[in-house]
Amino acid sequence: MSDLWKTKEVSSQCQCFPLVIVQGFLGRAESRIWGDFERHLNHDCHGLVFDSVGPVSSLHDRACELYYSLVGGTVDYGEEHSAAHGHSRYGRTHAQGLYPQWSLENPIHLLGHSLGGPTIVKLQYLMKQGHFGPRAHPDWIRSINTISSPFRGSQAVYTLGERVDAAPEVRPFSMGAMLSKVIHTISYFSPILPKAFDFHTESRRMSFLDISIPSLLNRMWKSDWAESYDAAPYDVTFESADQREANQEGQPHPRTFYRSCATYLTEKVEGNENFHTITSSNLLSFPFSPPLYFLARVMGSFDFSKIQPVPSFLDEIKVPDDVEQGLLTGDHRKSLPEEYWANDGVVPLFSQWHPASCSSIHCQHAETMSPTPGIWYVEQWNNTSHMSLVPLWVASDCQKQYWLNLGRWLRAIELQN
């Protein structure tokens, strides 16, 4: 991470649009968690909107919930989508939207952490497709900004329980299987639990108001949520990411600005193999949890050749077809670049850059003080974990620097109106 933004101040004479914050998997976007970052962002220029979407829901469902929470009304997941995935078409009703004036004249900036990034990309894609009707337009989104987002999937989901050969099936007794049981239990009692335990599961009828205890036990035995194609875990698989890329999701819109912050804290170990691990200095530098340490090590030595179907990014490696299955073992392991193993404890570096490969998207892996719409700008932060910048505010130097940079970036965009 360079100090490019420190070299030039951007004029404050601009029209400020609100910044909508979208959290990731199992996260909550609210000011008491994200903390006192606003004074570093904009000196009271940009209004902030903390949005709430299903913390375990699929990207499609989260995008729909995001849209209707902003404009108001009853969440409509779409007739075709809901029928295909076996849940109700309509979700909760928002009597008052968080930003009901959202329009071409009143666009917004969006910031997504982790799964919040692909959620925002899915929202713009659905707007392009006319999912929300003819009035909604992708130009309503002035900029998309992301932090540590798994655009192209993550090997972490397989480590936690997703089957490498039969996703979205989950391995019994894995962390993912245990987590699904906890989510079903919390959702069952959600009508009487605090708001912090709100999983937005109305359309799936998972509470005691809709199902019996025997039905709950059946779902805990084999989850129709966790082992479906319409859930957050599956959307983080490489297979799901490939499907989104095939549909051209995430291709930059010509009048929207894009910026991603890619984080990593691992380094290549000594030797010929392309293994990555966390250094002792990084362990001392972060309030680092054992789960992130474990995931970072496993992700840094992951064998991609076990995944079926074979991820599309292997096609980007120029090797003969007859060695593809052995590409990531033995001598062929060195053929895959380091960014596939470098990670922040949750997401590999290459997946955080942007949707799709660099060869199929207009991107620039460098900072700029003169952003151009339709280009995906990527900046990389080393020695930075998945949780270093957001959501928990600890007033670290890297957190302050990120928000200062983001504020200058947004003002540079708004000066172009």
Task: Give the residues covered by each predicted segment.
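Lipid deacylating catalytic domains
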Residues: M1-L111, L115-N417
